[in-house]
């Protein structure tokens, strides 16, 4: 199965914005090449997780090998490497691009170029990939392929004279795409005689075989008898099996340069087979690893706590297992007076955080409380020490610190220009600095802002979508740290500080956020048998307060008329009981209350 000459190999991926039809196109390619029979076909075939199908997004990388008979009568092997399209998963995209020689740039013919598409196209151009523009959804009534072609030329600078119009849904244009992959994407370089180097572009955990590693061989070859060495972890393994994804796994005896395959070697943890790492052979090792490997850095942090303290060991096991298939997830144990034992977790972004939470609840049957997300702050202490703080509750007191710096991102928003004003208003509310505004076409505009990451990780994306009826898209990247006048806002429930509700806010916004927070908590925390004071404070200064009135039994219901002193005695007795309850009572805060901090609008 693997005796295909290198000249007849093609490795490519599909670049697209969310909802532009990438997974449907991948399905159609698999079907047209006969890789998957029509009977076995299900929508979004390469999206294996239920969660991916439900949300209609691609999270984990998949790969599939297709055999295709081209117009010249030769049989070609096409390796499709599927990529995620969301900003949180750009690291996964960068790895899969490194494993390819070409890419299909899929653009919705009714919507045009979106921010995410651009970010990934630039990554592809950096990797010198051959890009084939494909206009999808041409069967839609609102499709305007010519206008979109001009847009691609003016924004990206790609020649669209050979752009292919297709409809992945109806199958129009699919044969042309397959032929273009053969004709226009170069075959891999023939480095079979060099030392073996293979790039790991994905790995997942299989409970029976250990970690399954997906790789692309850049030079040399790997056979089943070889002993392999992973260059960054310096660990060596005997191979149990190697094979190709067609798209189900098929064992083979050997693979050579240019091919994409998988291996199983009883590897215990994904941390040992890091994505982006280089595989080489123990007896003929390569001198240096492949370039461009960067460890994924978490941008957003939050606390995860089980609602039932007995589930703490289960949560730890679940996170361990999840990390086996998610190289970007970082976590460490933490405790909180209000919540007990839990974990402080780091994520690539908000979508990544939601997905991890949902997978923990769904696949491991856990009931979780998630605290508000925060970013990493750089705090300079009076004694000159610099601390990196990812948990607002651990921010040092004002008298001990000199300055606080927060991460800033450069954000590009693409939108129809009717929504210009409302988007600029949103960015200003979120402390954004206006940098530039460019008209891409007569009716589409790019807004460029520099904005604190902390303002983006809450509900910026939701707000942007709702203000523009879903038409805007954005892309951002980190540009460094800047000093700001930030304060720690604590929330006191029944005079006890609730750590998970602590946030770091700009001094000018503190009153508004504090007031909004206690008002929201008043709605969400159920009444107890005693009065609960809710307060927002900066240090020892209370800046906003609300109270939840007590539930009270009508102790006077049996007193019909009669002496007032009897009634007073009963009321006094009730008040005394409430006071005792208040000093001993614990307030249960529902999960919605913690999420309220997350969704609390800054406007």
Swiss-Prot record:
It is found in: Cell inner membrane. It catalyses: GTP + H2O = GDP + phosphate + H(+). It comes from the Bacteria. Gene3D superfamilies: 3.30.70.240, Elongation factor 4, C-terminal domain, Elongation Factor G (Translational Gtpase), domain 3, P-loop containing nucleotide triphosphate hydrolases, Translation factors. Keywords: Cell inner membrane, Cell membrane, GTP-binding, Hydrolase, Membrane, Nucleotide-binding, Protein biosynthesis. One of its GO terms (molecular function) is ribosome binding. Its main location: membrane. One of its GO terms (biological process) is positive regulation of translation. Pfam families: EFG_C, GTP_EFTU, GTP_EFTU_D2, LepA_C. One of its GO terms (cellular component) is plasma membrane. GTP binds at residues 19-24, 136-139. PROSITE patterns: G_TR_1, G_TR_2. Residues 7-189 form the tr-type G domain. It is a peripheral membrane protein. Coiled coil: none annotated. Its EC number is 3.6.5.n1. Belongs to the TRAFAC class translation factor GTPase superfamily. Classic translation factor GTPase family. LepA subfamily. Required for accurate and efficient protein synthesis under certain stress conditions. May act as a fidelity factor of the translation reaction, by catalyzing a one-codon backward translocation of tRNAs on improperly translocated ribosomes. Back-translocation proceeds from a post-translocation (POST) complex to a pre-translocation (PRE) complex, thus giving elongation factor G a second chance to translocate the tRNAs correctly. Binds to ribosomes in a GTP-dependent manner. This is Elongation factor 4. It comes from Prochlorococcus marinus (strain NATL1A). The lineage of its organism: Bacteria, Bacillati, Cyanobacteriota, Cyanophyceae, Synechococcales.
